[in-house]
Curated annotation (Swiss-Prot):
The protein's name in its UniProt record: Reticulon-like protein B21
Region called Disordered, residue ranges: 1-43, 65-86, 113-149, 446-487
Biased composition, class Basic and acidic residues, residue ranges: 26-38
Location of the protein in the cell: Endoplasmic reticulum membrane
Entry annotated with the keyword Transmembrane: yes
UniProt membrane topology term: Multi-pass membrane protein
Keywords: Endoplasmic reticulum, Membrane, Transmembrane, Transmembrane helix
Pfam families given in the database record: Reticulon
Organism: Arabidopsis thaliana (Mouse-ear cress)
Membrane-spanning segments: 242-262, 264-284, 354-374, 413-433
GO cellular component terms given for this protein: endoplasmic reticulum membrane
Domain Reticulon span(s) in chain numbering: 230-419
Domain of life: Eukaryota
Biased composition annotated in UniProt, kind: Acidic residues: 118-143, 446-463
């Protein structure tokens, strides 16, 4: 039996790690020596020397030796056990130019079966030679070697995941038997190689615009739902819940009105609460949790960023809605400015007699009564307002001395009012004048639009009333020869 050299390629779907095979100078010389030598003992000796040189150089990562029982040959008369020793050598090397071009690794298999071009003696006649007894006991067992193979797998290697060249050599030894079939040889699991991969971590603020829009929409709907629940409570849409809240608040207001001996300051309240908390903490630490004071000193005490964000998420919807309403009230529109000017002036003049507690009481009662009453009886209030406005307008139009009455009223108010009231009155007169101008412009524009609409409607009606004129058909010309038939 003679060794042979063959090339093989693995499938592209092979799960083994990508490796590249580069034949070192010493290893290539050893393989050529194996092919040229005739005795297996000499071949084994050369292989052992090469392995010893590689071990000393530190060129490979791991050496694995194991013995595997092989199947007996069908032509043999005795069933002898067959041992297989495989030496796996994995080492990093440089990638040759040919391998870099095609991105694959080559595989070389040297076995005991030789081709016609490469034949060597099997060495069966030299088993009993006296020169082999000079070697060690390991070399005596190696004389019985009949087959020697060097397998190097060919694996497609992805260029982007290539880490380095890896060379694998396998040496197998069998006793006096033919080489087993590939199915009888147990495959060695490939070594696990961890490759350095670049991991890209996306920045925290790299969210897409759609995600941000969806989050904003969810927050907006959530805030709208909260405001809607508050409106339902104030407008008595849920009667049981509104009754409970209004009754409890009214009870607290009435009970606090009769408790005259609860006159205290804010500083006194804070001081008393601090004393109570201090006493509770002293009792808790000294009696209940004794010995835990030193451990808790190292704990971080303070407000975390998550707590602040949570509080802001709760407050922001109400704050944004309040700012939106305030922006509408202070928009600068003449009609809105007249209403807000009167309300703010009254609050400014009477604010000294209004305390925070009184404002809270009147605000609570007004929130549960005024909106409901106004919405329920808005038609009646508008009817009464239009009636009295019509009466005052008729009285003013029927007055013969309008200028004198207006001058007398202005002089009386101006002399009885303070400087602040005079400034406010001048400002309100200017706003009223602008409101009158806007109203007149709006009425004229509306009248022009109404006239244009009326003219268009009249033109359409005239078009519909006038019947369309039918065109007369031209007279037909008849030839005499076509009117009469020849009898």
């Amino acid at each position: 039996m003679t060794p042979r050299r063959s090339l093989s390629s693995s499938d592209s779907n092979d799960k083994s790690p990508s490796v590249s095979v580069v034949a070192k100078k010493a290893r290539s010389e050893s393989v050529e020596g194996i092919e040229k030598k005739t005795t297996p003992g000499r071949v084994k000796k050369i292989r052992s020397e090469v392995c010893t040189t590689i071990v000393k150089a530190g060129e490979f990562d791991s050496v694995a030796l194991r013995k595997v029982n092989s199947l007996p040959s069908p032509n043999s008369e005795k069933s002898d056990t067959k041992t297989e020793q495989e030496v796996t050598i994995i080492e990093n090397s440089k990638i040759p130019e040919e391998v870099k071009e095609f991105g694959v690794c080559q595989e070389m298999i040297v076995s005991a079966k030789s081709n016609e071009n490469e034949q060597i003696d099997n060495g069966d006649q030299e088993i009993g030679d006296q020169d082999d007894y000079e070697e060690d006991g390991d070399e005596e067992e190696e004389r019985e070697v009949e087959k020697k193979s060097v397998d190097v797998k060919e694996i497609n290697v992805a260029k982007e995941n290539r880490v380095g060249g890896v060379e694998i050599k396998k040496f197998s030894q069998f006793q006096n038997r033919t080489s087993p079939s590939p199915s009888s040889v147990r495959k060695i699991s490939p070594p696990v190689i961890k490759r350095a991969t670049s991991v890209y971590s996306a920045p925290p603020n790299s969210t897409s615009s759609t995600d941000r829009f969806a989050e904003q929409e969810d927050n907006f709907t959530h805030s709208q739902s909260k405001l809607q629940s508050l409106v339902d409570l104030v407008m008595w849409r849920d009667v049981s819940r509104s009754t409970l809240v209004f009754g409890f608040g009214t009870f607290l207001i009435i009970s606090s009105s009769y408790a005259n001996d609860l006159n205290f300051s804010f500083i006194s309240v804070v001081a008393y609460m601090g004393l109570i908390y201090l006493g509770l903490m002293f009792v808790l630490k000294s009696l209940i949790h004794r010995g835990m004071v030193e451990e808790e000193r190292h704990k971080v005490v303070g407000v975390r960023e998550e707590d602040v964000k949570r509080m802001l998420r709760l407050i922001m919807p109400y704050l944004n809605e309040s700012l939106h309403q305030l922006r509408a009230l202070f928009s600068g529109d003449p009609s809105t400015t007249l209403k807000m000017g009167v309300v703010l002036f009254v609050l400014a003049r009477c604010g000294s007699s209004i305390t925070l507690w009184n404002l809270a009481k009147f605000g609570f009662l007004g929130a549960f009564t005024i909106p409901k009453i106004f919405i329920s009886y808005s038609t009646h209030f508008s009817a009464y307002g239009n009636f009295w406005m019509r009466r005052f307008r008729d009285a003013w139009e029927s007055c013969n001395h309008k200028k004198a009455v207006a001058l007398a009223l202005f002089t009386l108010v101006w002399n009885l009012s303070s400087v602040t009231a005079r400034v406010w009155a001048a400002f309100m007169l200017l706003v009223a004048f602008r409101y009158y101008q806007h109203k007149m412009i709006w009425t004229t524009d509306q009248a022009d639009d109404d006239e244009d609409d009326n003219e268009e409607e009249e033109a359409e009606e005239e078009k519909e009333q006038v019947p369309p004129k039918h065109k007369r058909a031209p007279p037909h010309m008849m030839m005499p020869n076509k009117l009469k038939k020849i009898s």
